[in-house]
Every structure is written in C-alpha cells, then in structure tokens.
From Swiss-Prot:
Keywords: Activator, DNA-binding, Nucleus, Stress response, Transcription, Transcription regulation
Induction context: Induced by drought stress, salt stress and cold stress. Induced by abscisic acid (ABA). Induced by methyl jasmonate.
Annotated protein name in UniProt: NAC domain-containing protein 2
Pfam families in UniProt: NAM
Region described as Disordered: spans on this chain: 185-210
Domains (record comment): The NAC domain includes a DNA binding domain and a dimerization domain.
Subcellular location: Nucleus
Compositional bias of kind Polar residues: 190-200
DNA-binding residues (ranges): 114-176
Molecular function in Gene Ontology: protein homodimerization activity; sequence-specific DNA binding
Disulfide bonds: none
GO CC entries: nucleus
Signal peptide per UniProt: none
C-alpha cells in the first residue's frame, strides 16, 4: 500500500471522512472556506490541512507531514519578513529557497477579491546559483487585511500569521520515488516470507546438513551385531624365587611359568629332560611320592631312573 493511500485511509478514520473522499478544492474555495476562516479563527469545514512552517524544510520532506494527499499536499504556514522593517517575505527554506515565477493572480469568489495567488519554484542551494527543481508551490494569502494587521507590529519579523500553500511535484518524481520504495519493501517482505517457509512450526530451521544427519542412508546396517574386539592372549605368570619359599611352593611356582594351554609340548619329553629343567633352577623337590604319581600320565615316555635320584615332573 502506498504512503499516500495509507495517509488517506488514516485521515478517513481519524477525521470521519466518507469512503472515497477526495480533496481537490478550487482557488476560490481554498481562500473563502479555508484561508479566511483560519485567519478569523473560525471552524474549518474539514480539519484536513496541517499547520507546518514550510520554510524550515525541504519540499521533498513535506509530504510526510501532510494530513492528506497523494500527489498534492496542503499546509497552513506563517510567513516572516526578510528584513525587520520591510515587506518582502523571507523565501529561504531548508537547503535552498523558493523563487517567485509569473505574475500574482487575484482570487475573487463572486467578484470580490479576497486573496492573492502566487506561484513559486524551489531551488536547491544558495541564491543566486541554486539548482532549479520540479517542486512547485502555490501560495494563497489574504488581500491586504492580514498584511495590514502584521504591519501594525513595528519591528516584528512576522509578515503573515497564516498563508495557505498547495505543494506538488511537476514531474511527479516524489510519487515515483515512493513507488520504488514500495517495490523494494514488497521484495524484502517476499524474501522474509520465503525464509520463514523453510522454518518448522517449532522454530527449528532445516539445513542441508541437518537433512543428512537426520536421514540414515544405510538403515540395513543396523541389523548387524556390534563388533567386539578379541581378548588378548593369555600370558604366563612369572613368580620370582624367594629364599623363604619351601620346596613345594617353589615347585608350584615353577610349574606356573609353563603355559597350561601348551601341554602338548611335553608329549616327547623324557625323565632326563624334565630333570634337566629343574637342574637349571638349582633345586629339586624332595620326596619320591610327589613325582611317582606323575608317571601315570600316558604323555611321558618311561625311562629307567638313576639310582638314588628322585623322579619328578611338573603337573599340567
């Protein structure tokens, strides 16, 4: 919706204007029904004209301060003198100045001159080298009555309490500029709407990465059992020899140094081989009863023991 249309709808609501209301008064209507009543402090037909000091602003900043209008805007504004004792108005405004063009035109409803109409063009910059713009203003002032009252205040800069101004852009550049802004705003709103469409109702924004994480590309692999590493191989426990050990304990410790799972190593061992194993330990467990039970094993080859020597074998 354009700025002018929004302003008109606001005015329709605030001022209780009928739908489709248009404000296009003639010069006679402006002077007789609005300017004269404003100067006299009377009630206006419709309070639709804003009170703004036009000479404090550039013309392109004024449409936003108007109460109504899309292509032309109306204001009540005071006028000051250029010099304290002179009658020329001060035309400096904003970053430029207004310059009169053409001859003054009397406004005479029903044959009686009530006001004067003057046309002015806005120049940007300082006089006399300002740049002419397309902003036009029609200024309506009362014929002599207002000026006479103001002139009575000697030394005052106020020339007129109120004049009525109609402002417009000759090439309608302001409206085109507003339309360009509206196009940009609509494009921005469209982009924002599209970005919201990619957001779930719970506020989580979906991204390509989240889609990859959420969707398992190989669901059939879930049926395979989890990989379990094999346990490390058993190692032999070494028990150090201590002087305080008795013979039976030392023999058991020596047996523990031999892996139990590798008992096949003793299949071809003879008694002499076994005895040689213990001779390396500088000790032989005493007692023939301890070793005699070992010869019952079918794994050990029978040999003739030496006289006076004990027989022994590590149990497995």
């Amino acid at each position: 919706m354009g700025m002018g249309m929004r302003r008109e709808r606001d005015a329709e609501a605030e001022l209780n204007l009928p739908p489709g209301f248009r404000f296009h008064p003639t010069d006679d209507e402006l002077v007789e029904h609005y300017l004269c009543r404003k100067a006299a402090g009377q009630r206006l037909p419709v309070p639709i004209i804003a009170e703004v000091d036009l000479y404090k602003f550039d013309p392109w900043d004024l449409p936003e301060r108007a109460l109504f209008g899309a292509r032309e805007w109306y204001f009540f504004t005071p006028r000051d003198r250029k010099y304290p004792n002179g009658s020329r108005p001060n035309r400096a405004a904003g970053n430029g100045y207004w310059k009169a063009t053409g001859a003054d035109k009397p406004v005479a409803p029903r044959g009686r001159t009530l006001g004067i109409k003057k046309a002015l063009v806005f120049y940007a910059g300082k006089a006399p080298r300002g740049v002419k713009t397309d902003w036009i203003m029609h200024e309506y002032r009362l014929a002599d009555a207002g000026r006479a009252a103001a002139g009575a205040k000697k030394g005052s800069l106020r020339l007129d309490d109120w004049v009525l101004c109609r402002l417009y852009n000759k090439k309608n550049e302001w409206e085109k500029m507003q339309q360009g802004k509206e196009v940009k705003e609509e494009a921005s709103d469209m982009v924002t709407s599209q970005s919201h469409s990619h957001t779930h109702s719970w506020g989580e924004t979906r991204t390509p990465e989240s889609e990859i994480v959420d969707n398992d590309p190989f669901p059939e692999l879930d049926s395979f059992p989890a990989f379990q590493p094999a346990p490390p191989p058993a190692t032999a426990m070494m028990v150090p020899k201590k002087e305080s050990m008795d013979d039976a304990t030392a023999a058991a410790a020596a047996a523990a140094t031999i892996p139990r799972n590798n008992s096949s190593l003793f299949v071809d061992l003879s008694y002499d081989d076994i005895q040689g194993m213990y001779s390396g330990l500088d000790m032989l467990p005493p007692g023939d009863d301890f070793y005699s039970s070992l010869f019952a094993s079918p794994r050990v080859k029978g040999t003739t023991p030496r006289a006076g020597a004990g027989m022994g074998m590590v149990p497995f």
